[in-house]
Amino acid sequence: MSAPRIWLAQALLFFLTTESIGQLLEPCGYIYPEFPVVQRGSNFTAICVLKEACLQHYYVNASYIVWKTNHAAVPREQVTVINRTTSSVTFTDVVLPSVQLTCNILSFGQIEQNVYGVTMLSGFPPDKPTNLTCIVNEGKNMLCQWDPGRETYLETNYTLKSEWATEKFPDCQSKHGTSCMVSYMPTYYVNIEVWVEAENALGKVSSESINFDPVDKVKPTPPYNLSVTNSEELSSILKLSWVSSGLGGLLDLKSDIQYRTKDASTWIQVPLEDTMSPRTSFTVQDLKPFTEYVFRIRSIKDSGKGYWSDWSEEASGTTYEDRPSRPPSFWYKTNPSHGQEYRSVRLIWKALPLSEANGKILDYEVILTQSKSVSQTYTVTGTELTVNLTNDRYVASLAARNKVGKSAAAVLTIPSPHVTAAYSVVNLKAFPKDNLLWVEWTPPPKPVSKYILEWCVLSENAPCVEDWQQEDATVNRTHLRGRLLESKCYQITVTPVFATGPGGSESLKAYLKQAAPARGPTVRTKKVGKNEAVLAWDQIPVDDQNGFIRNYSISYRTSVGKEMVVHVDSSHTEYTLSSLSSDTLYMVRMAAYTDEGGKDGPEFTFTTPKFAQGEIEAIVVPVCLAFLLTTLLGVLFCFNKRDLIKKHIWPNVPDPSKSHIAQWSPHTPPRHNFNSKDQMYSDGNFTDVSVVEIEANNKKPCPDDLKSVDLFKKEKVSTEGHSSGIGGSSCMSSSRPSISSNEENESAQSTASTVQYSTVVHSGYRHQVPSVQVFSRSESTQPLLDSEERPEDLQLVDSVDGGDEILPRQPYFKQNCSQPEACPEISHFERSNQVLSGNEEDFVRLKQQQVSDHISQPYGSEQRRLFQEGSTADALGTGADGQMERFESVGMETTIDEEIPKSYLPQTVRQGGYMPQ
């Protein structure tokens, strides 16, 4: 901290620590030391002494003193009360450069009152200055420099002192602490003693003194007017000239000369022994022809004492031209040709650099020799020549020419296209190093004339533009000297060239510097199965690879599952994901990696099928085969059992349409024009019709074994035929003898004769009152007859005076019960009521159907016997009384006499039997 700032801070503290009642008063106390400076790392103790007047005014003592550093209270452990007026504070290992230390007292209700304050500084004492040196600049005062040592962190004064043996020179106060220039001109050839003194608040120290002659510390002024000239006789020399002062000739100086080419950064030193003697000119030799050089020069006392002058200003010059030092690099390319006898050959060469051209190249001379006697010469100003050559062997030579002369010829053998190259380099490698692309190889066993290196950028969007360079036969490692780009793939080819022609070529790919791919691969599914998927992708275009693709990574996951990653070699373009779940959506992302990083491609999704390929077929085909086999077995079984099946499903039912019963009804006109006696009864049978009046009596219950309708018991006793089951139930078809007025027919009729049909006519025909028809359910599967399908054809004609009555035709009607035992649960009375409630047409139809059934399906001998026995047992005699008794025996009520229909029973008997009445 500077002195003005310290005094300002102290003045501020003074005003803060004095009481003011219209005037300034003395402070209450003081701090000792008042200006403390402490060496860093040491201990320091400060003392605060209170005045007696302050003690009495504020009613305090030393125990009320509070120490603060930078407005922070000092811990009580560091404070010591010496007596009632004195308190001390101790600091250990002081490290802060500056500390504001104040002494305060607590008065009037613990109010802090500042008493006094000081600024405590810390630092180091000055080190002893070292390395004291002095330089006498030509024409200027002497400048001395030294090393002050470590930083003191305090204000330190450095003073340069000098004296002769008998005289002291004025001191030089250093402003920077490291150097000082004296205010007087030194005297040469008289020794002077010089030293440095350093002083601050913590101490004072002096350097070692040096004693010297100022002339030995002289630093000359730089040479000037430096010029460079060349020589036409010698293209490898340049002449230099300059001017140096040397204290106006009082000093002998030697020179130091350096040079470099214009584009170089490194200077070349001229040997010092060549310039030991004082001079103002010099000739530099062994330079390259037609090359621009830059020179500089400096001087020093010839004895070597003192200091080198600063470098002079640079000067440049160009050597004279010379013939080219070496032939150009020479190579050829064969262009595609449509002819078979000639070929197009493009001869190419590199322009010589200035260091080898030794001048300006005017043109190139190309000589093509097919044989020793045949040659062609071409003069070309460019760097290529295209010629048409035969398929013979040629030798081409190339020479560059400037105004001084021609270079040596470069010879290249162009073999016949039928010759095959035999040798090539081996172990070809390429690698980047120091921002250069290096190529290394092993030479072939045959001696080589030179090597040709070719390279180009591989791209799918642009053609491969080749660049090339030539290397000597002794080289097997070099770097490509073209302008190479990063992240580009270069195809490098090395071809050895022999005296007989070029050998085999070897190629490889390399990058100057790789990077991450510009884009990732696009993956797709080639085949998706139930538990696996074949992924396929295309190679990334070489323009987007930016390096060698080392491997691929495939990341796949489900919508809720964990992501799985697999790594695939870069040579593959397909990969099979296995252990997948069926009927699941998968998200796939693929990345390609080079040596410098990777790049992800777009995300792709696919769904695995629920069933594997062929799995459905494996299920469906056996099921279909099993079904087919079952069907075939069923068909075979049905075929073998067709008779049994037909019996249960399609039984043989008589065709009612072929029945002629309807034509035998006396009340129904025949629907067919035929003679009944001639056609149906050719044997003389005829119809015997009987009219029977039936009286109902229900006083007696029906026996349990009687299940037939009572009306049907009134059939003729003499008949032996059986009622057919057609058109009526089995209960109603029980065989009963009929009542006939002619009793002689009963004995005359044989047991073999049968009733062909019978017709029951209700008594309602007398009253001409039609009744509601009653139908029973039929089990027949045959189609209905015309009269059944069209009931409107049915007619019921009654005559009041007993005229003819036309009844409807019902050739066939079959009920559920086919045997008497089939209806045991229905009472005889209920069945009788059902019959009585029907109209005349119902009974006519029932009997017609019974007769038809008898005609189509006659009973067996046993059935006829049982029927005859039942008929005989039920017969009760003839006459009206007999009729009444038979009716009562079946339980019919006599009170319904008017409701019981009369039976008109036509019967068919053979000749000599019962005749119709």
From Swiss-Prot:
Single GO BP term: interleukin-6-mediated signaling pathway
- Which residues, if any, are the signal sequence? 1-22
Its keywords, alphabetically, are: Cell membrane, Disulfide bond, Glycoprotein, Immunoglobulin domain, Membrane, Phosphoprotein, Receptor, Repeat, Signal, Transmembrane, Transmembrane helix
Motif Box 1 motif — list its residue ranges.
649-657
User: What does the UniProt entry report for the null mutant?
Assistant: Progressively lethal between 12.5 dpc and birth. Embryos show hypoplastic ventricular myocardium without septal and trabecular defect, reduced numbers of pluripotential and committed hematopoietic progenitors in liver and reduced differentiated lineages in thymus. Impaired differentiation of astrocytes and decreased number of dorsal root ganglion and motor neurons at 18.5 dpc. Decreased volume of mineralized trabecular bones, while number of osteoclasts is increased.
Residue numbers of motif WSXWS motif?
308-312
Where is this chain's protein located in or outside the cell? Cell membrane
Annotated membrane topology: Single-pass type I membrane protein
- Domain (Ig-like C2-type) ranges: 26-120
- Please give the Gene Ontology molecular function terms for this protein: ciliary neurotrophic factor receptor binding; coreceptor activity; identical protein binding; interleukin-27 receptor activity; interleukin-6 binding; interleukin-6 receptor activity; interleukin-6 receptor binding; leukemia inhibitory factor receptor activity
An example Gene Ontology cellular component term from the record? cell body
Report the glycosylation sites: N43, N61, N83, N131, N157, N225, N388, N476, N551
Q: What is known of its domains?
A: The WSXWS motif appears to be necessary for proper protein folding and thereby efficient intracellular transport and cell-surface receptor binding. The box 1 motif is required for JAK interaction and/or activation.
Q: How does it assemble?
A: Component of a hexamer of two molecules each of IL6, IL6R and IL6ST; associates with the complex IL6:IL6R but does not interact with IL6. Forms heterodimers composed of LIFR and IL6ST (type I OSM receptor) which are activated by LIF and OSM. Also forms heterodimers composed of OSMR and IL6ST (type II receptor) which are activated by OSM but not by LIF. Interacts with HCK. Interacts with INPP5D/SHIP1. Interacts with SRC and YES.
Name-wise, this protein is Interleukin-6 receptor subunit beta
Q: Give the originating organism.
A: Mus musculus (Mouse)
